[in-house]
Protein backbone atom coordinates (compact mmCIF):
# COMPACT_ATOMS: atom_id res chain seq x y z
CA UNK A 1 0.00 0.00 0.00
CA UNK A 2 1.21 3.49 -0.62
CA UNK A 3 2.09 5.56 2.41
CA UNK A 4 1.19 9.11 3.19
CA UNK A 5 4.37 11.08 3.72
CA UNK A 6 6.80 8.29 2.85
CA UNK A 7 7.32 5.33 5.10
CA UNK A 8 9.09 3.41 7.60
CA UNK A 9 14.93 0.69 10.56
CA UNK A 10 17.08 -0.71 14.07
CA UNK A 11 17.68 -0.43 17.63
CA UNK A 12 15.58 1.82 19.78
CA UNK A 13 18.21 4.53 19.71
CA UNK A 14 17.40 7.64 17.74
CA UNK A 15 13.79 7.90 18.87
CA UNK A 16 12.21 10.77 20.73
CA UNK A 17 14.11 14.01 20.33
CA UNK A 18 16.66 12.37 18.07
CA UNK A 19 15.76 13.92 14.74
CA UNK A 20 18.24 16.74 15.06
CA UNK A 21 17.96 20.03 13.25
CA UNK A 22 19.82 22.21 10.82
CA UNK A 23 19.98 25.95 10.40
CA UNK A 24 20.30 25.51 6.64
CA UNK A 25 16.90 25.91 4.98
CA UNK A 26 16.58 24.67 1.41
CA UNK A 27 14.29 26.66 -0.85
CA UNK A 28 12.95 25.23 -4.09
CA UNK A 29 12.65 27.85 -6.81
CA UNK A 30 9.70 27.58 -9.14
CA UNK A 31 10.19 28.04 -12.86
CA UNK A 32 7.13 28.79 -14.93
CA UNK A 33 5.46 25.64 -16.22
CA UNK A 34 7.85 23.21 -14.52
CA UNK A 35 6.33 22.42 -11.12
CA UNK A 36 3.01 22.90 -9.36
CA UNK A 37 3.01 25.12 -6.30
CA UNK A 38 1.71 22.27 -4.11
CA UNK A 39 4.52 20.02 -5.38
CA UNK A 40 7.10 22.74 -4.75
CA UNK A 41 5.90 23.16 -1.16
CA UNK A 42 5.97 19.37 -0.58
CA UNK A 43 9.50 19.09 -1.99
CA UNK A 44 10.74 22.02 0.09
CA UNK A 45 9.22 20.55 3.25
CA UNK A 46 10.73 17.14 2.45
CA UNK A 47 14.21 18.57 1.85
CA UNK A 48 14.09 20.45 5.16
CA UNK A 49 12.61 17.62 7.24
CA UNK A 50 15.10 16.64 10.01
CA UNK A 51 13.65 13.11 10.14
CA UNK A 52 14.38 12.67 6.42
CA UNK A 53 18.00 13.70 6.98
CA UNK A 54 18.35 11.48 10.05
CA UNK A 55 16.85 8.46 8.29
CA UNK A 56 19.60 8.73 5.67
CA UNK A 57 22.29 9.06 8.33
CA UNK A 58 20.95 6.08 10.30
CA UNK A 59 20.44 3.88 7.25
CA UNK A 60 16.67 3.60 7.60
CA UNK A 61 14.46 3.15 4.56
CA UNK A 62 12.31 6.19 5.38
CA UNK A 63 11.43 8.80 7.99
CA UNK A 64 8.47 6.65 9.10
CA UNK A 65 10.94 4.34 10.84
CA UNK A 66 11.04 6.89 13.66
CA UNK A 67 7.28 6.63 14.16
CA UNK A 68 7.63 2.96 15.06
CA UNK A 69 10.75 3.66 17.13
CA UNK A 70 8.92 6.35 19.12
CA UNK A 71 5.79 4.23 19.62
CA UNK A 72 7.96 1.30 20.71
CA UNK A 73 9.95 3.51 23.09
CA UNK A 74 6.68 4.45 24.78
CA UNK A 75 4.87 1.09 24.81
CA UNK A 76 7.68 -1.50 24.60
CA UNK A 77 5.91 -3.59 21.96
CA UNK A 78 8.88 -5.20 20.24
CA UNK A 79 10.92 -7.84 22.07
CA UNK A 80 13.57 -10.40 21.19
CA UNK A 81 12.23 -13.59 19.67
CA UNK A 82 8.83 -12.23 18.63
CA UNK A 83 7.20 -12.98 15.29
CA UNK A 84 5.93 -9.96 13.36
CA UNK A 85 3.71 -9.32 10.32
CA UNK A 86 4.05 -5.93 8.59
CA UNK A 87 1.15 -4.94 6.33
CA UNK A 88 1.87 -2.36 3.63
CA UNK A 89 5.60 -2.73 4.20
CA UNK A 90 7.02 -0.53 1.41
CA UNK A 91 9.59 0.93 1.44
CA UNK A 92 10.59 -1.27 4.38
CA UNK A 93 11.40 0.95 7.35
CA UNK A 94 8.98 -0.70 9.79
CA UNK A 95 10.11 -4.20 8.81
CA UNK A 96 13.71 -3.00 9.18
CA UNK A 97 13.05 -1.76 12.72
CA UNK A 98 11.13 -4.88 13.70
CA UNK A 99 13.77 -7.28 12.37
CA UNK A 100 16.61 -5.60 14.23
CA UNK A 101 14.80 -5.36 17.56
CA UNK A 102 13.38 -8.91 17.60
CA UNK A 103 16.66 -10.39 16.34
CA UNK A 104 15.34 -11.75 13.04
CA UNK A 105 17.97 -13.22 10.70
CA UNK A 106 18.01 -14.71 7.22
CA UNK A 107 18.66 -18.11 8.82
CA UNK A 108 15.73 -17.71 11.24
CA UNK A 109 13.38 -15.06 9.83
CA UNK A 110 10.77 -13.79 12.28
CA UNK A 111 9.38 -10.87 10.27
CA UNK A 112 7.17 -11.07 7.18
CA UNK A 113 6.19 -7.97 5.22
CA UNK A 114 3.71 -7.57 2.37
CA UNK A 115 3.12 -4.82 -0.18
CA UNK A 116 2.05 -4.62 -3.81
CA UNK A 117 4.98 -2.23 -4.30
CA UNK A 118 8.46 -3.68 -4.66
CA UNK A 119 10.59 -3.60 -1.50
CA UNK A 120 14.34 -4.11 -1.79
CA UNK A 121 15.57 -7.10 0.26
CA UNK A 122 16.06 -6.58 4.00
CA UNK A 123 18.12 -8.78 6.35
CA UNK A 124 15.91 -11.10 8.36
CA UNK A 125 12.70 -10.18 6.53
CA UNK A 126 10.57 -12.30 4.21
CA UNK A 127 8.93 -9.94 1.72
CA UNK A 128 5.79 -10.81 -0.27
CA UNK A 129 5.15 -8.63 -3.32
CA UNK A 130 1.36 -8.79 -3.52
CA UNK A 131 -1.72 -6.83 -2.49
CA UNK A 132 -2.79 -7.55 1.08
CA UNK A 133 -6.40 -7.29 -0.12
CA UNK A 134 -5.94 -10.34 -2.39
CA UNK A 135 -7.86 -13.35 -1.11
CA UNK A 136 -4.70 -15.47 -0.97
CA UNK A 137 -2.65 -12.93 1.00
CA UNK A 138 -3.59 -13.91 4.59
CA UNK A 139 -2.71 -17.57 4.10
CA UNK A 140 0.52 -16.72 2.28
CA UNK A 141 1.54 -14.49 5.19
CA UNK A 142 0.88 -17.24 7.71
CA UNK A 143 2.67 -19.85 5.60
CA UNK A 144 5.71 -17.56 5.32
CA UNK A 145 5.80 -16.81 9.06
CA UNK A 146 5.17 -20.41 10.10
CA UNK A 147 3.45 -19.51 13.37
CA UNK A 148 0.98 -17.07 14.87
CA UNK A 149 2.41 -13.55 15.14
CA UNK A 150 3.01 -11.69 18.40
CA UNK A 151 2.44 -8.37 16.67
CA UNK A 152 0.68 -7.20 13.51
CA UNK A 153 1.73 -3.73 12.37
CA UNK A 154 0.21 -1.72 9.54
CA UNK A 155 1.27 1.61 8.10
CA UNK A 156 -1.06 1.19 5.12
CA UNK A 157 -2.81 4.20 3.68
CA UNK A 158 -4.87 4.39 0.52
CA UNK A 159 -3.49 6.64 -2.24
CA UNK A 160 -4.70 10.14 -1.46
CA UNK A 161 -7.28 11.89 -3.62
CA UNK A 162 -7.01 15.33 -2.05
CA UNK A 163 -10.53 14.97 -0.65
CA UNK A 164 -10.04 14.60 3.09
CA UNK A 165 -13.20 12.63 3.89
CA UNK A 166 -12.73 10.24 0.97
CA UNK A 167 -9.12 9.62 1.99
CA UNK A 168 -10.22 8.99 5.57
CA UNK A 169 -12.92 6.49 4.59
CA UNK A 170 -10.59 4.57 2.27
CA UNK A 171 -7.87 4.33 4.90
CA UNK A 172 -10.33 3.32 7.63
CA UNK A 173 -11.44 0.48 5.34
CA UNK A 174 -7.83 -0.72 5.15
CA UNK A 175 -7.63 -0.49 8.96
CA UNK A 176 -10.76 -2.60 9.31
CA UNK A 177 -9.42 -5.29 6.97
CA UNK A 178 -6.08 -5.26 8.84
CA UNK A 179 -7.89 -5.51 12.19
CA UNK A 180 -10.00 -8.45 11.01
CA UNK A 181 -6.80 -10.19 9.94
CA UNK A 182 -5.05 -9.41 13.22
CA UNK A 183 -7.81 -10.82 15.42
CA UNK A 184 -7.88 -13.99 13.31
CA UNK A 185 -4.14 -14.73 13.58
CA UNK A 186 -2.61 -13.10 16.70
CA UNK A 187 -1.36 -15.09 19.65
CA UNK A 188 -3.20 -14.44 22.92
CA UNK A 189 -1.51 -11.42 24.50
CA UNK A 190 -0.42 -10.11 21.10
CA UNK A 191 -0.71 -6.52 19.88
CA UNK A 192 -2.01 -4.69 16.80
CA UNK A 193 -0.79 -1.29 15.56
CA UNK A 194 -2.38 0.48 12.60
CA UNK A 195 -2.39 3.88 10.97
CA UNK A 196 -5.68 5.71 10.54
CA UNK A 197 -6.73 9.26 9.71
CA UNK A 198 -8.60 11.54 12.08
CA UNK A 199 -12.15 11.87 10.83
CA UNK A 200 -14.60 10.38 13.29
CA UNK A 201 -15.96 7.42 11.31
CA UNK A 202 -13.97 4.60 12.89
CA UNK A 203 -16.52 3.70 15.57
CA UNK A 204 -17.03 0.13 14.34
CA UNK A 205 -13.28 -0.41 14.23
CA UNK A 206 -12.86 0.91 17.78
CA UNK A 207 -15.72 -1.27 18.99
CA UNK A 208 -14.07 -4.37 17.51
CA UNK A 209 -10.68 -3.55 19.01
CA UNK A 210 -12.12 -2.80 22.46
CA UNK A 211 -13.98 -6.10 22.37
CA UNK A 212 -10.95 -8.16 21.34
CA UNK A 213 -8.10 -6.41 23.20
CA UNK A 214 -7.63 -5.38 26.82
CA UNK A 215 -6.69 -1.78 25.97
CA UNK A 216 -6.85 0.54 22.95
CA UNK A 217 -4.82 3.74 22.60
CA UNK A 218 -4.74 6.64 20.14
CA UNK A 219 -1.11 7.54 19.48
CA UNK A 220 0.48 10.41 17.53
CA UNK A 221 4.27 9.98 17.67
CA UNK A 222 6.50 13.06 17.41
CA UNK A 223 7.68 11.93 13.96
CA UNK A 224 4.15 12.41 12.62
CA UNK A 225 4.01 15.88 11.16
CA UNK A 226 1.99 18.27 13.30
CA UNK A 227 -0.23 19.26 10.38
CA UNK A 228 -0.89 15.65 9.37
CA UNK A 229 -4.27 14.05 10.10
CA UNK A 230 -2.65 10.64 10.52
CA UNK A 231 -3.07 8.89 13.85
CA UNK A 232 -2.17 5.42 15.10
CA UNK A 233 -4.43 2.97 16.88
CA UNK A 234 -2.65 0.61 19.25
CA UNK A 235 -4.61 -2.38 20.53
CA UNK A 236 -2.76 -4.24 23.29
CA UNK A 237 -3.10 -7.69 24.87
CA UNK A 238 -5.28 -9.70 22.51
CA UNK A 239 -7.79 -11.73 24.49
CA UNK A 240 -7.66 -14.70 22.11
From Swiss-Prot:
The gene is rlmE. Residues 1-33 are annotated as: Disordered. One of its GO terms (molecular function) is rRNA (uridine-2'-O-)-methyltransferase activity. It catalyses: uridine(2552) in 23S rRNA + S-adenosyl-L-methionine = 2'-O-methyluridine(2552) in 23S rRNA + S-adenosyl-L-homocysteine + H(+). Belongs to the class I-like SAM-binding methyltransferase superfamily. RNA methyltransferase RlmE family. S-adenosyl-L-methionine binds at residues 92, 94, 115, 131, 155. Keywords: Cytoplasm, Methyltransferase, rRNA processing, S-adenosyl-L-methionine, Transferase. It is an enzyme of class 2 (transferase). This is Ribosomal RNA large subunit methyltransferase E. Specifically methylates the uridine in position 2552 of 23S rRNA at the 2'-O position of the ribose in the fully assembled 50S ribosomal subunit. GO terms for cellular component: cytoplasm. Residues 1-20 have a biased composition (Gly residues). Its EC number is 2.1.1.166. It is found in: Cytoplasm. It holds the Pfam family FtsJ. The active site is at 195 (proton acceptor). It comes from the Bacteria.
Amino acid sequence: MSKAGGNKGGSRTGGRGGAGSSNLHVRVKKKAGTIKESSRRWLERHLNDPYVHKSRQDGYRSRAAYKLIEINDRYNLLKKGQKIIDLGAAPGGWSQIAARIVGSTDENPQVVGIDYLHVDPLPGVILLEMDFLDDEAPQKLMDALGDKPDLVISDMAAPTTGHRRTDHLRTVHLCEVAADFAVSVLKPGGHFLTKTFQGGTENELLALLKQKFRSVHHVKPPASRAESVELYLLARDFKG
